[in-house]
Amino acid sequence: MISKFIEKRMLNMLDEWYSAMSKRKMNHVCTLKEKIDQHLPKIKKNTKLWMRYQLFQARHQLLFENQNGLDSLFDGLYGLEDKMDDELKYYLYFFSGLYEMVKTAPKHAVHHFKKAEQYLAAIHNTFEAADLYYQTAGAYYLMKSPPLSVQYVKKALHIYLHQFGYIKKVITCKLLLAVNYIDQERYEKAEQLFKEIIKKTQQLHDENLLCHAYYNLGFLKATEKKDQEALLYFRKVLKNQEFEMNSPVSYLHCVYESVRALFKTGNITEAKAVLQKGKELSEKVDIQTIYLKLKTLEALYTSAEDPYEQLLEYVLELEKIEAWVDLEVLLEDITEYYKKKDDFEKAAFFIMRG
């Protein structure tokens, strides 16, 4: 047991830690965690504080895209669910949804976000609702549902725009809005918004957020089949070691798109080097989807003979893990490959799997 005074003090420290995470104050987040970890013996003596700490530890890892030990951490937390009040249950489901997003399983993420929304009334913080709406919007974007994604991101943006101190959240919402414009083929509007975001982010000196903006602008150019322009932005991200370390999953998405653009523009040596780095990193951080996508590109662009058997194996693996959005573009690339070989039977086979 610990005294009420110490319990209140520890609770305030934990909430300050979570608030810093919500505002993406990365350095402050790490400083607060170090400070809190010094009090772990006290925190472990109080069940509610210990559950809260473990939940926020999961959020901390997700912020830095670190999946190490998260499966066992969440298993343990679900075993304590009957001891949680509605506030802690909200965090449990919300963070579970975020974990599914890191694993690129948006359908499962939405399931958890909807359960979290049932407990939203227990959270006396408007910004928590905004964060939930934003993350739900992100899941719908990955599910190729722009209308629902835009609806949710605008709800989040409305909350953030009316409060001081959430400029980075406003920017992340606008980034998500812009990538939805890409899906809606509103390319000029997307580019204009990306460039506004880059200018603002440069003023904030937030390298992590800036890398996200550069990547997305590169993705727009790749979508427009302007691969040389796309590479100008992708290379800015690839050379940022801090982004690679702190946001490895996002970095890997850029690696994949870079490899694709490099092969298409004939930069074979660079493509192979980036691809090898991507395979090693995706195995290290255990991102199966990106690993399979990179192996597919490798088979498609470097095989001396017909890579049909390899391609089929990777496509079936991606289907098994329901990576439908990822498959969509890959299948187009594979189909185009066989069309150029005048093998229309195989081209038709792969396009029908889309």
UniProtKB/Swiss-Prot annotation:
Record key words, sorted: Cytoplasm, Repeat, TPR repeat
Repeat among keywords: yes
InterPro entries, sorted: TPR-like_helical_dom_sf (IPR011990), TPR_rpt (IPR019734)
Tree of life domain: Bacteria
Membrane-spanning parts: none
Main location: cytoplasm
Ranges in a coiled coil: none
GO cellular component, one term: cytoplasm
Subcellular localization: Cytoplasm
Gene3D superfamilies per record: Tetratricopeptide repeat domain
TPR repeat residue numbers: 64-105, 107-126, 130-163, 171-204, 211-244, 321-353
Database matches in Pfam families: RapH_N (PF18801), TPR_12 (PF13424)
SS bond list: none
Family: Belongs to the Rap family.
Protein name per Swiss-Prot or TrEMBL: Regulatory protein RapD
The organism of origin for this protein: Bacillus subtilis (strain 168)
Lineage, highest ranks first: Bacteria, Bacillati, Bacillota, Bacilli, Bacillales
